[in-house]
Swiss-Prot record:
This is Mlc titration factor A. One of its GO terms (biological process) is proteolysis. The lineage of its organism: Bacteria, Pseudomonadati, Pseudomonadota, Gammaproteobacteria, Enterobacterales. One of its GO terms (cellular component) is cytosol. One of its GO terms (molecular function) is metallopeptidase activity. It holds the Pfam family Peptidase_M90. Keywords: Aminopeptidase, Cytoplasm, Hydrolase, Metal-binding, Metalloprotease, Protease, Zinc. It comes from Erwinia tasmaniensis (strain DSM 17950 / CFBP 7177 / CIP 109463 / NCPPB 4357 / Et1/99). It is an enzyme of class 3 (hydrolase). Its cofactor is Zn(2+).
Length: 260
């Protein structure tokens, strides 16, 4: 287990970490100064309170540790740090890893097989990631392994099970389920027509509601323009849940850049 050397130190030492450089990635470029400062504070707390376990001789420098913490905290920027209390450890492999998976088919038969995984979110357990795919999570590609696994934890908060419906007001549940299932059907239909490789949204989202929520959370933060175009009503529901509007933030950033 790797214990960060600053875990027991105070915020003054947190300030010595390369936060400004860590924030300088495309995914975070549209944050306001106030949001960047708040995210930095959340990420510093994350590094102090979570145990990051580097496996198979993986090593991360201070900059990449900071960037990883920023990714973990982006989804809870306006929800609050306590939304990350569903886990205490993050296990990180250098590359995608092999697991012994067990699943039950529609006939009740249990199957066991070895599978390659990019990440996992264990119910009432750690988050497991791999550094190779984390490195593809800093841009605006629509892919973000960290946000995907954090979304599973947020989904399971309250009920204890990830089912595609995160903790929202009861009056919102019916509409949420309707719009999420409609998106799953559209994503699956597109994949059937053009093929998985050519689909605009990862077809994995069509596999079940929990994966749809996690995959669309990736697009919500890293490709909001695609999400809002394809599923405008569902996008607004995500805005209300996460208490953020990445598309609007991106528009404001583009306007500011154009003026400058």
């Amino acid at each position: 287990m790797i214990k960060w050397p600053w875990k027991s130190q105070n915020d003054a030492l947190d300030a010595g970490l390369p936060w400004q450089q860590a924030l300088d990635i495309p995914l975070l470029s549209s944050l306001s100064a106030a949001e960047s400062q708040e995210l930095r504070q959340l990420a510093a707390r994350f590094l102090r309170q979570k145990s990051l376990i580097l496996l198979q001789e993986l090593q991360l420098d201070r900059l990449n540790r900071c960037r990883l913490a920023l990714l973990f905290c982006l989804p809870v920027l306006h929800l609050g740090y306590e939304w990350l209390d569903g886990f205490h450890e993050v296990l990180i492999y250098p590359d995608p890893f092999v697991v012994d998976d067990e699943w039950q088919d529609e006939f009740g038969l249990v199957h066991r097989e070895r599978m390659v995984q990019a990440g996992q979110s264990w119910q009432q357990g750690p988050i497991v990631l791999n550094w190779l795919d984390i490195q593809d999570s800093f841009d605006r590609s629509g892919y973000n392994l960290v946000i995907h696994e954090v979304a599973h934890k947020l989904d399971a908060r309250g009920s204890g099970e990830a089912n595609g419906v995160p903790p929202i007001a009861l009056r919102e549940v019916t509409g949420w389920e309707r719009d999420l299932h409609a998106a799953m059907i559209q994503i699956g239909d597109e994949s059937d027509i053009v093929g998985a490789a050519a689909a605009s949204i990862d077809p994995y989202a069509a596999s079940d509601p929990a994966e749809c929520f996690a995959v669309l959370s990736e697009y919500f933060f890293s490709a909001p323009e695609l999400f809002i175009t394809r599923f405008p009503a569902l996008y607004q529901r995500f805005c209300r849940f996460y208490r953020q509007d990445p598309w609007q933030r991106l528009q404001q950033d583009n306007t500011t850049s154009a003026v400058q």
